[in-house]
């Protein structure tokens, strides 16, 4: 045993253990306390990958923590960290028709918040998303500006959509659900795969940042799956496989 400060090897006495069980020592020359062989605090990469896959596949944070023997806060931090390092979700090179709609959920003390989405009709990839407290024209316009440009846009009869600039694309109001079935289906996927969006559920987001991180992680994996299915239609693929 060698002191990391004065580099002496004599008079190195034991002085208890760390919470993880590693033996600690004290150098009687310089009074430096140290742990020669500390145990790693980080979980294995396989455990982290498994937790993220379970989250994308529909399990909530606390249930994942119970199954893997973790703390739910650890899983939450992993989701945020993974979302922060991901690029924007991949999208098709060309978009002919796009559909827009919104999903409402709760945040904090059951306050209502909206998730506005724009979806490609053909491949059903998410082209853009906004998390807002109010469905304002400015927020929806920003989403349209950032998304890939389409030739046709469809939505329900919410009046804000009719006042947007679509960069030369043609806008039409859907008659019933006939022209918005793709975005309705993708929004249903959000509620199916993200436990925090389940209806009549006790699982809801505490802050907008957590909701945005969950949406980015899921949409990234979902879009990759959709593009994979377009390229290889005969091979089955699940969303969790693209984490």
Features from the language model and the residues they span:
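Residue-level recognition of single "structural anchor" positions
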Residues: 1-243
């Amino acid at each position: 045993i060698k002191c990391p400060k004065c580099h002496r090897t004599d008079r190195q006495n034991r002085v208890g253990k760390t919470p993880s069980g590693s033996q600690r020592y004290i150098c009687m020359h310089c009074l430096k306390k140290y742990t020669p062989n500390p145990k790693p605090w980080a979980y294995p990469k396989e455990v982290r990958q498994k937790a993220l896959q379970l989250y994308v596949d529909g399990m909530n944070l606390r249930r994942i923590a119970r199954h893997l023997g973790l703390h739910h806060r650890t899983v939450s931090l992993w989701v945020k960290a993974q979302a922060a390092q991901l690029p924007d979700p991949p999208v098709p090179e060309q978009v002919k028709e796009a559909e827009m709609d919104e999903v409402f959920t709760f945040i904090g003390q059951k306050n209502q918040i909206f998730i506005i989405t724009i979806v490609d009709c053909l491949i059903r990839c998410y082209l853009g998303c906004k998390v807002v407290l109010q469905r304002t024209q400015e927020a929806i316009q920003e989403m349209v500006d950032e998304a890939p440009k389409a030739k046709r846009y469809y939505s329900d009869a919410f009046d804000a959509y009719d006042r947007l600039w679509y960069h030369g694309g043609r806008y039409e109001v859907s008659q019933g659900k006939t022209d918005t079935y793709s975005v309705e289906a993708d929004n249903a996927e959000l509620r199916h795969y993200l436990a925090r969006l389940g209806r009549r559920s006790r699982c809801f987001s505490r802050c907008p940042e957590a909701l945005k991180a969950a949406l980015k992680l899921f949409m990234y994996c979902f879009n990759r799956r959709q593009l994979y299915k377009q390229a290889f239609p005969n091979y089955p693929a699940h969303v969790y496989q693209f984490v």
